[in-house]
Amino acid sequence: MESLIALVNKIQRACTALGDHGEGSSLPTLWDSLPAIAVVGGQSSGKSSVLESVVGKDFLPRGAGIVTRRPLVLQLHRIDEGKEYAEFMHLPKKKFTDFAAVRQEISDETDRETGRSSKVISTVPIHLSIFSPNVVNLTLVDLPGLTKVAVDGQPESIVQDIENMVRSFIEKPNCIILAISPANQDLATSDAIKISREVDPKGDRTFGVLTKIDLMDQGTNAVDILEGRGYKLRYPWVGVVNRSQADINKSVDMIAARRRERDYFQTSPEYRHLTERMGSEYLGKMLSKHLEVVIKSRIPGLQSLITKTISELETELSRLGKPVAADAGGKLYMIMEICRAFDQTFKEHLDGTRSGGEKINSVFDNQFPAAIKRLQFDKHLSMDNVRKLITEADGYQPHLIAPEQGYRRLIESCLVSIRGPAEAAVDAVHSILKDLIHKSMGETSELKQYPTLRVEVSGAAVDSLDRMRDESRKATLLLVDMESGYLTVEFFRKLPQDSEKGGNPTHSIFDRYNDAYLRRIGSNVLSYVNMVCAGLRNSIPKSIVYCQVREAKRSLLDIFFTELGQKEMSKLSKLLDEDPAVQQRRTSIAKRLELYRSAQTDIEAVAWSK
């Protein structure tokens, strides 16, 4: 069972080393889940003397005002033999055998965190391990003494600051409260009892300790309290007799003080019947045993919590991405990998693995054909317009057989209007591709880390799409112009021939251009234009896909990659200027993950179920 307390000690030290102090944080905390015994009391309650009595050594700083300004995690390790010594976690290679030096180091380490002349407090704990054959395996957290008034230039908030710190420790359900109260004061005014009652109203995890029993007024005693009648707790009260200030000034050692404490209870008529559960030695053994039981009961839940938290931290760490490489080659490789991830996401949208690419089909199947249908060819082929163009094309010499030049002008005037829908189709596909670029940007988690790289890649991709759009527009309009530039003669040769096709040259020009004749010309032209439109409905989508979609899949970032290989280290670093908040978050999560994995390994190595 002793290994269980050692296990918690080890995890507590790891928590402090890796920045988990249990205070409010956006990261999960393991510290708050560990069973601990917090020592709570007013500044004049005898709290320090109780701790020194349990340890059997003088090692705590003393003085007026607030002496304890940081939590002291006191880990006691029982050894079979050898000289007593102490170790601080912040000085791992140094053993202290002089406990006066331990006292000084506690003061110095407190000043390093809070400032030498400062009166402020800090939640960052000091870890002190004491190895001795005269102690039990136990961990105690010494907290600053509660006070009611700020003195000696202390900030006005110090009273509330201390109370908030103490409360933040003892309100946790895994915290065992050791409430120190002086017997020579009314228990109703006890700072320790007052605050412990607020967080543990039923007294289920509070141990009461009465100090200064030997200093009570003559004719009074603490029997009612010690027997649970004055203030009832789940666990029995423990009375202790500490060294007086005169004893401390005379350097009375702890062995003599413990002997005198035993003699006091054994010879006292009031407390003789309670001797077996009184005194600092009994207090230490009782707390050690209780802590072992609590730790064992918490281990299964702690394991589940650790496993769940490791999974959550790993997921977030993966989402945040890898840290930036230090060398130019590593940076270049990172950028290339991120760009490839983006490019792959973009291709998946086009290929149908992701949504969005189907909108291009909608342009070809719906938007483009509908735009052609909306072209008002009937206006171009109205009776007046046909007569006008035919007449203008004939010039001063009327046509002999068929008005070929008139036909050409009519067809050209219709086909030129197709340029509008063709350009609109090019622009519509361009707009869809740009939307897919922005969508792919948002879906490429790595790009979220690097705002500058995101802007550069987005700009390069859009520039490529713009170039492809321009090429596509040229190719698409060329298809339309080709239809205008060379007509399919065979179409007209297959048209039904009429005797009136050319008219009688001897008739007047107005007789020759009668309504029936002009209607036939308009009908023939419309049939030809419809044939051309049917062909363009097939060829224009092919041109757009070839020039825009296919090229976007094949070479979207080619120019960016070429320029990237020529960039210097400083410019590569600028592209990877990750948000400092993300960097800090990744570092914090990595440390916290290290803590949880270490705790998981430590727990699995302990045969706690035996």
Swiss-Prot record:
Domain GED intervals: 518-610
Region (G1 motif): 41-48
Matches recorded under InterPro entries: Dynamin, Dynamin_GTPase, Dynamin_GTPase_CS, Dynamin_N, Dynamin_stalk, G_DYNAMIN_dom, GED, GED_dom
Region (G5 motif): 241-244
EC number: 3.6.5.-
CDD domains linked: DLP_1
Annotated GO MF terms: GTP binding; GTPase activity
Amino acids binding GTP: 44-49, 212-217, 242-245
Function description: Microtubule-associated force-producing protein that is targeted to at the leading edges of the forming cell plate during cytokinesis. Has a GTPase activity.
Protein name: Phragmoplastin DRP1B
Species per Swiss-Prot/TrEMBL record: Arabidopsis thaliana
Phylogenetic lineage: Eukaryota, Viridiplantae, Streptophyta, Embryophyta, Tracheophyta
The gene coding this protein: DRP1B
